[in-house]
Curated annotation (Swiss-Prot):
PROSITE patterns, A to Z: DS_RBD, RNASE_3_1, RNASE_3_2
MF terms (GO), sorted A to Z: double-stranded RNA binding; metal ion binding; ribonuclease III activity; rRNA binding
Major site of localization recorded for this protein: cytoplasm
Pfam families: dsrm, Ribonucleas_3_3
Domain RNase III per the UniProt entry, residue ranges: 5-125
Domain DRBM: 153-223
Cited NCBIfam families: RNaseIII
Protein name, UniProt field: Ribonuclease 3
Cell compartments where the protein resides: Cytoplasm
Catalytic site positions: D44, E114
Length: 230
């Protein structure tokens, strides 16, 4: 164990065998090309699957759409930044000169949180990283009350994000309708003129296609650091 990381290992609840993986997970691209971005990509997928599985098993009567919305709430934005801070990740982030003072930035905290998950997965195995993730998330998941929680649909959430950032609302239009009457496939385009964004999605109804397009745009906004403010 590297002495300066022994406290951090205790907070995480995991001891790295290859501490260089942790170093990379904490290193921002402003510091070096050997940064956390690839680990973030991996950790994002691992986290999404683990949370999807636990929600599927815990909320057996919840429909697919609501499960997706609840998962999105748990694996994006403020939730990740808060978890990263609670695990003291902000104290160990390695930044270049151009990003000094960015340890508390929500987007950086989100990215590092996912990167650390990716690093733990590579350093161990899926069962181990799953156990670690569930330990971190246990207080959040155990406090979920479906009677009081309000999970917004993607279009409502997108509208809220844009309004909170003084941006015009998106416009939806049908590009094509393919297939026979009983098995039609709708292709919908969602546009944000202020952000010059255009996304396309498909669904078996106009409503479903619009929801999917809104979800894609939310993901793009998240990558730009725009999230729903609580």
């Amino acid at each position: 164990m590297v002495p300066e990381y022994s406290r951090f290992y205790n907070i995480l609840g995991y001891n790295f065998k290859d501490y260089t993986l942790l170093i990379r997970a904490l290193t921002h691209r402003s510091k070096t090309k050997k940064n956390y971005e690839r680990l973030e990509f991996l950790g994002d997928s691992v986290l999404s699957f683990v949370i999807a599985e636990v929600l599927y098993k815990q909320f057996t009567d919840l429909a697919e759409g609501k499960l997706s919305q609840l998962r999105s709430k748990l694996v994006k934005g403020t939730t990740l930044a808060q978890l990263a801070s609670s695990l003291k990740m902000d104290e160990y982030i390695i930044l270049g000169a151009s990003e000094q003072g960015g340890h508390k930035r929500e987007k950086i905290l989100e990215d590092v949180f996912e990167a650390v998950i990716g690093a733990i997965y590579l350093d161990s195995d899926f069962a181990t990283v799953k156990k670690v993730i569930l330990k971190w998330y246990q207080p959040i998941i155990s406090s979920i009350n479906l009677d009081t929680i309000k999970v917004k649909d993607s279009k409502s959430k997108l509208q809220e994000i844009l309004l909170q950032n003084a941006l015009s609302l998106p416009e939806y239009s049908i590009e094509t309708i393919d297939g026979k009457d009983h098995e039609q496939q709708f292709t919908v385009v969602a546009m944000s003129k202020d952000l010059n964004l255009r996304v396309k999605a498909q669904g078996t109804s106009r409503k479903k296609a619009e929801q999917k397009a809104a979800e894609k745009m939310i993901e793009m906004l998240s990558q730009q650091g725009l999230h729903e403010k609580k």
